A protein has these predicted regions:
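Enzymes that bind and transform nitrogen-containing heteroaromatic metabolites
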Residues: 1-163
Length: 163
């Protein structure tokens, strides 16, 4: 594992409910999410993710890519606020913290890094939830990768996609 992007969506492609991915998550997704974080050197997120998701604590260094000068996760001693492109932040994170980077950002940062060929693996959870906000075509997202595997745990579909 080098650079892995993690994303949860509802069955209809919803990426959030009430501005948080927790609304489209499931128990099985949450377990996979926590296990995934134990295997990385650093987590990279965007400013919006930092403002709307619970990042007051992180098990490893947390890089927040944002144009703001205000750290949205004050109190997280492992957080780093970097005003630079996601690609530059990814390169800097690898040099400072190690090569195993987990991108837990929103779709705009994840899609940008995929477009630049900087995501080695996508771990996509598709839950039974519908009726959320900001939908994406998750099947088209999977099709951007050459290979993918699928498992189902308690109604949540897990896809691992690689090029």
């Amino acid at each position: 594992m080098s650079t892995v992007a993690s994303l949860v969506v509802g069955r209809d492609g919803s990426t959030s409910k009430d501005k948080s991915s927790n609304g489209v998550s499931s128990d099985a997704d949450r377990k996979a999410f926590l296990a995934r974080r134990r295997k990385v050197d650093c987590i990279l997120i965007g400013g919006n993710t930092a403002r709307h998701e619970p990042y007051k604590q992180s098990p490893v260094p947390l890089v927040i890519v944002s144009r703001s000068t205000i750290n949205p996760v004050v109190g997280n001693d492992l957080s780093h606020l970097w005003n630079m492109s996601p690609a530059d932040a990814l390169a800097k994170a690898k040099s400072q913290f190690g090569v195993r980077i987990l991108v837990e950002a929103g779709t705009s940062i994840i899609f940008e890094l995929i477009d630049q060929g900087l995501i080695d693996q996508l771990e996509l959870s598709v839950t039974p939830v519908t009726g959320g906000d900001d939908p994406i075509d998750w099947q088209a997202l999977l099709n951007r990768f050459e290979n993918h595997t699928h498992t189902n745990v308690d109604g949540t579909d897990f896809y691992i996609a690689r090029n």
